[in-house]
Curated annotation (Swiss-Prot):
Organism: Arabidopsis thaliana (Mouse-ear cress)
One term of GO molecular function: long-chain-alcohol O-fatty-acyltransferase activity
Cellular localisation: Membrane
TM regions (residue ranges): 9-29, 36-56, 82-102, 122-142, 146-166, 231-251, 295-315
Keyword Iron-sulfur attributed: no
Membership in a protein family: Belongs to the wax synthase family.
Presence of keyword Transmembrane helix: yes
Any GO BP: lipid metabolic process
The protein's name in its UniProt record: Probable long-chain-alcohol O-fatty-acyltransferase 9
GO cellular component, one term: membrane
Topology term for the membrane: Multi-pass membrane protein
SS bond partners: none
Function recorded in the entry: Catalyzes the final step in the synthesis of long-chain linear esters (waxes).
Catalytic reaction annotation: a long chain fatty alcohol + a fatty acyl-CoA = a wax ester + CoA
Length: 341
């Protein structure tokens, strides 16, 4: 644990120095190709940094924060696009907006409830997370379907527990309102609603600016608007799948199986098809669907496709059990350190 913490400090000091270079040097270079060339070495470094860890949590979070999010943000920043534009007024804000999955909320007064920290809901998630961690002790006795559902619940609850307080702390430290990372994904009424408006919203926002919008604009000339929109969804989900394959590689150091990429491509195809079908006059006029039914269908599709393509790799590699064991080990490590005092 001590060695991993040392690597963690070294990696994140390197990241802060790199982002500082972008703030003081790259920001003063003319927008476009020249600024892009100035940030590309930093993006390359961010893809190397997760390799310094053997911990599942450190490697996956560094890959998510730096390799995926920060790299895309800096590429968009090179063209005065994305969440880093306009440039933050000081270095601390620029570093935080680059290195963490946060985004400034432009109209905080219109959405006051999203900035409120729900203590009761958070306490319930902590309790659920504690139960999930200990259920892994009996994973060998659980049916495959139960184990897959456990992985899905573990992933969602852990992300909420980690990212929710992070958003609150950074909002207080920076003195500004930040957008939420999740918006009750279990209430999604469509795939478009789930992926675009409820699940991991910071990733959705960056991918929309960096992948979806450019692809859709590029395809509008040779194709009609419907096919351009479909290609935007397909390429965006493909890129997301490739990023997830990369995260798996950082954690397991094994050759990708491409199951996760297939999961995202399938969801991209179905989301694009869903959007196209919903825009038809026949469906709008003659096929209204109750919200309860649409929620059941949406979550059923995500859970079933995730159980077939996304989570089997978690189980085969023992990744979720490693995450659970690391969490319990870290809590024990902190307890022992504090007991000294």
């Amino acid at each position: 644990m001590e060695e991993e913490l040392k690597n963690f400090i070294i990696v994140w000091i390197s990241a802060i120095i790199s982002v500082s270079y972008c703030y003081y040097i790259s920001a003063n270079i003319k927008t476009g190709v020249l600024r892009l060339f100035s940030v590309l070495p930093i993006c390359g470094l961010f893809f190397v940094l997760p390799l310094f860890f053997s911990s599942v949590h450190f490697s996956s979070s560094t890959a998510f924060y730096l390799s995926e999010m920060a790299s895309l943000k800096l590429i968009l920043f090179a063209f005065d696009q994305g969440p880093l534009f306009p440039v933050a007024p000081n270095l601390i804000q620029f570093v935080c907006f680059t290195c963490f999955p946060i985004k400034l909320q432009r109209n905080p007064k219109s959405q006051p409830s999203q900035n409120h920290f729900h203590k009761r809901a958070f306490a319930i998630k902590i309790m659920i997370f504690g139960v999930v961690l200990h259920v892994y002790n009996y994973s060998h006795f659980l049916p495959q379907t139960v184990l897959l559902s456990l992985c899905f619940l573990h992933l969602y609850v852990e992300l909420e527990i980690l990212l929710g307080p992070l958003k609150v702390l950074l909002s207080m430290a920076l003195g500004c309102d930040l957008e939420p990372q999740f918006n009750k994904p279990y209430l999604a009424t469509s795939l478009q609603d789930f992926w675009g408006r409820r699940w991991n919203l910071m990733v959705s926002s960056v991918l929309r600016s960096g992948i979806y919008n450019p692809v859709r604009c590029a395809c509008q000339r040779p194709m009609n608007s419907g096919w351009a929109r479909f290609m935007g969804y397909l390429v965006t989900f493909l890129v997301s799948g490739l990023f997830h394959e990369l995260v798996y590689f950082y954690i397991t150091r094994e050759t990708p199986t491409w199951e996760v990429t297939l999961f995202f491509v399938l969801n991209g195809v179905c989301t694009g098809t869903e959007v196209a079908v919903k825009r038809t006059a026949f469906l709008q006029r003659w096929w209204p669907v109750r919200s309860s039914v649409s929620r059941l269908l949406t979550m059923g599709f995500v859970v079933v496709t995730g159980g077939l393509l996304f989570f089997p790799l978690f189980i085969r590699s023992g990744m979720m059990e490693r995450r659970a064991n690391e969490t319990l080990f870290f809590l024990d490590f902190v307890k022992r350190k504090f007991s000294i005092f």
